[in-house]
């Protein structure tokens, strides 16, 4: 677990005695533990997330960098049963096309297809799902890619802040298939749906990450 509850905020960092270099090293170690320790979890306990923890997780997202400081995000945290039921119902309408995509992508791993479809039917029992939208529907073609990246950066912040609190997460892109319906229902007047973060207390041991090779170069 990310050492130090809320360690991303300077005021709550438990600074060790010693030089400024030692203090800096401790902060960096905690941050790297969070980055490397976070995993996607797809099965959750029924325990609700305290409202104050959810607020802090969202606030962490709002601290993310954004293109031209536009802060082009709008987040909707679903916690009510009727809202979650609506989400699951809309995702059900896209299940067939989603399965076809997964079968093409994982043709040698059919178990992955089945596991994913089972997860998508009820998001692993999560009681809290954050939908990430663009704040406006009319960003220019030049700005749009950067605005999408900005929302993604905020969502990553939320995943790390959740991990800091012992709360598991899973970034889900499949919700965009039902983006029009979800946007009309939950975010009228705002922009397109970029993705979702599923939150909860883990009820499974996540798989280790298998990193693909040759994905960067230092010159």
Question: Where does each model-flagged region fall?
Answer:
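Glycine/small-residue-rich phosphate/adenosyl-binding loop
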Residues: 77-150
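Short acidic N-proximal helix/loop "leader" segments that mark the beginning
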Residues: 26-48, 52-56
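C-terminal helix-cap and adjacent tail motif
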Residues: 33-41, 117, 193-219
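Glycine-rich phosphate/pyrophosphate-binding beta-alpha loops
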Residues: 65-69
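Short, Lys/Arg-enriched N-terminal segments with co-localized hydrophobic residues
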Residues: 9-28
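Small-aliphatic-rich amphipathic alpha-helix that forms the alpha element of a beta-alpha
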Residues: 56-57, 61, 128-130, 136-184
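Short, electropositive alpha-helical surface patch
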Residues: 182-195
């Amino acid at each position: 677990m990310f050492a130090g509850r809320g360690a991303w905020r300077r005021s709550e960092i438990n600074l060790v005695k010693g030089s400024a270099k030692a203090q800096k090293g401790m902060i960096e170690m905690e941050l790297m533990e969070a980055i490397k320790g976070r995993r996607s979890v797809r099965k959750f306990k029924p325990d609700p997330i305290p409202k104050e923890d959810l607020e802090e997780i969202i606030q962490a997202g709002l601290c993310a960098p954004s293109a031209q400081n536009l802060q082009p995000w709008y987040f909707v945290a679903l916690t009510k049963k009727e809202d979650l039921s609506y989400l699951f119902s809309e995702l059900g309408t896209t299940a067939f096309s989603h399965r076809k995509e997964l079968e093409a992508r994982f043709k040698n791993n059919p178990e992955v297809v089945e596991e994913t479809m089972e997860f998508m039917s009820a998001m692993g029992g999560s009681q809290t799902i954050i939908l990430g939208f663009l704040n406006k529907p009319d960003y220019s073609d030049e700005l749009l890619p950067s605005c999408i990246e900005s929302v993604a950066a905020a969502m990553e912040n939320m995943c790390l802040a959740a991990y800091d609190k012992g709360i598991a997460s899973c970034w889900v892109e499949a919700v965009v298939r039902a983006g029009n319906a979800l946007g009309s229902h939950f975010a009228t007047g705002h922009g397109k749906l970029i993705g979702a973060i599923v939150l909860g207390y883990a009820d499974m041991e996540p798989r280790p990450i298998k990193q693909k090779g040759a994905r960067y170069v230092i010159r």
